[in-house]
């Protein structure tokens, strides 16, 4: 494999790690109501587990409330049960037509738990980025031995790989810091 391809492949893997972290962080409740909080909830719909977003509309009328309006009234009990069974820890209010979810303010202890959780997620993303760099550098060194790639070209490629690595690690740190600030803001 050519060196440019190795760097491109490693960069793509690093980008995937950052995108995955961003997705993970979007599901962490930071005190503000967000429809994304309900993304992972599955509702039994005609015997099949179906994502809540496919059987109801989800709105946030204010920063502390999520409103779930089922497209079929008969689903309201199933939606309520799915939300209660989820790890969100939110008790739904069912008025027969829609479900309101009032988000209680986060306690200091819960905020610290969330920060600890996202710190672990960020560390996992960093490990993925480092692994992509290591694999690319190993492949570059191998190409020097087997394909006859010049040493100076290999050194330049390793330096380039390090720059890409540093850029993605910085991105991960920025995502973490932003989410941490969001969680810790009362």
From Swiss-Prot:
Any Pfam family hit: RRF
GO terms assigned for molecular function: ribosomal large subunit binding
Compartments, record wording: Cytoplasm
Keywords, ordered alphabetically: Cytoplasm, Protein biosynthesis
This protein's GO CC annotations: cytoplasm
CDD domains per UniProt: RRF
One BP term from GO: translational termination
Domain of life, per lineage: Bacteria
Protein biosynthesis keyword on record: yes
Coiled-coil stretches noted in the UniProt entry, renumbered to this chain: none
Main location: cytoplasm
Keyword field contains Protein biosynthesis: yes
HAMAP family, sorted: RRF (MF_00040)
Its job: Responsible for the release of ribosomes from messenger RNA at the termination of protein biosynthesis. May increase the efficiency of translation by recycling ribosomes from one round of translation to another.
Family: Belongs to the RRF family.
Name of this protein: Ribosome-recycling factor
Organism: Porphyromonas gingivalis (strain ATCC 33277 / DSM 20709 / CIP 103683 / JCM 12257 / NCTC 11834 / 2561)
